[in-house]
């Protein structure tokens, strides 16, 4: 993939995206997706053992979805009952209470893979290891600060951050047939993303910025990949559970795409001081936007449609 200097969309480009008429409105998916966590919580029983809890939150899928409309479910579990049978029963209870059952369930904790996968499959739902769990992570953070401390048996000593860190994995090369020809850093005001439902997008996913209290004037950084095989590239990316784009500055310095529970893909080599500085600027812009950024796929810079567009977050 060749390197391209960092650019910013000019006002005309933003206007084209926001005010383009006669677009085909693309509905990414009508399927319901859930995000799930099943793990111990900082609440102790009478034997000083931690309670476990299953937390389920519906994935918002689009920028216009109201956070308050997302289906949520939670249920505590005695530590002696932690197994796939209990989790399956809890899933069945959640499905009975939900407006619609999910087609798949995302989960981010690798150490719970076997139990979660078994319970989901026995319930007839596809389990998907994924770090694209923005709504779930925000609900977990809220419970850590506003809910658990007010519960009987709360143990501040055992409370920990909701984020989970794992050792970095070695990035893989993108399939040869899906290599892009050019790429560019871009920036877009948060409020411009409100128009995303009007853009012509073949594959993608997003979430409401209200989930993260992002100011409408915040500059959201992004990366556009230009490819003559834009649609196949976007279709492939839609199936690997994108997580976030990240510039790393080891040896060698790279621009990588994180996906699934632990996968990473090389988008470009940052092989000179200029591209490395651009990568650092991209990372700083992400930090200023609470980790929010986007990845777009187009056939060429003149295209007015997107083969793919994903709103992403790297949650630290």
Annotated model-derived regions:
Residues 2-316:
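Secondary-structure boundary/capping micro-motif
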């Amino acid at each position: 993939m060749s390197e391209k200097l960092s650019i910013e969309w000019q006002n005309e480009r933003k206007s084209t995206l926001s005010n383009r008429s006669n677009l085909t409105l693309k509905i990414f998916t009508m399927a319901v997706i859930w995000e799930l966590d099943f793990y111990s919580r900082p609440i102790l029983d009478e034997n000083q053992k931690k309670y476990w809890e299953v937390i389920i939150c519906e994935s918002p899928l689009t920028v216009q979805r109201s956070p308050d409309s997302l289906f949520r479910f939670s249920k505590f579990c005695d530590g002696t009952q932690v197994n796939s049978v209990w989790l399956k029963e809890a899933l069945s209870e959640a499905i009975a209470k939900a407006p619609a059952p999910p087609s798949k369930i995302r989960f981010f904790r690798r150490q719970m893979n076997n139990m979660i996968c078994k319970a989901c499959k026995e319930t007839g739902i596809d389990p998907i290891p994924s770090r694209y769990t923005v709504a779930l992570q925000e609900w977990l953070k809220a419970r850590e600060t506003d809910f658990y401390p007010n519960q009987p048996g709360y143990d501040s000593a055992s409370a920990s951050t909701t984020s989970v860190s794992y050792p970095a994995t070695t990035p893989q090369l993108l399939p040869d047939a899906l290599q892009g020809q050019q790429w560019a850093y871009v920036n877009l005001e948060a409020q411009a993303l409100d128009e995303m439902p009007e853009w012509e997008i073949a594959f993608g996913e997003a979430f409401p910025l209200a989930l993260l209290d992002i100011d409408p004037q915040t500059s959201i950084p992004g990366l556009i990949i230009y490819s003559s095989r834009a649609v196949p590239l976007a279709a492939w990316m839609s199936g690997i559970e994108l997580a976030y784009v990240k510039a790393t500055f080891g040896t060698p310095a790279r621009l990588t795409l994180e996906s699934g529970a632990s996968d990473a893909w090389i988008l470009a080599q940052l092989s000179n001081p200029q591209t490395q500085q651009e990568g650092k600027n991209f990372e700083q812009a992400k930090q200023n936007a609470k980790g929010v950024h986007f990845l777009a796929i187009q056939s060429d810079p003149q295209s007015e449609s997107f083969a793919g567009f994903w709103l992403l977050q790297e949650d630290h």
